[in-house]
Amino acid sequence: MSKGYEMVFAIINSGYSEEVMEAVKACGATGGTVINARGTANLEAEKFFGISISSEKEIVMIIVKKDIKDSVLKAIYEKVGLSTPGQGIAFSLPVDEAVGLGKTLEE
């Protein structure tokens, strides 16, 4: 079983998942999973952020080693953060244990 990992989530406007994957692979991540989603932000949220919020989203999930998590989050922010057309947010959650991740992560 693998330990010492974080799950990084990036929620971005639809069509920007490839940019996320390019950015995180440059930091040492090996891959991720993309899920199509729909946002539910209301007009008040749009007024607060001062931007138009698209309801069509993609969620990119990437399991990374803890030691590269900060650089992965920074790369996502720089590539598709709120001030970009991707209008993304990113966060991480600890992974207590994982199995079946393949040889790359279990070494």
What are these model-predicted stretches?
Residues 1-107:
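Positively charged, small/polar-rich N-terminal and surface patches that mediate targeting and assembly
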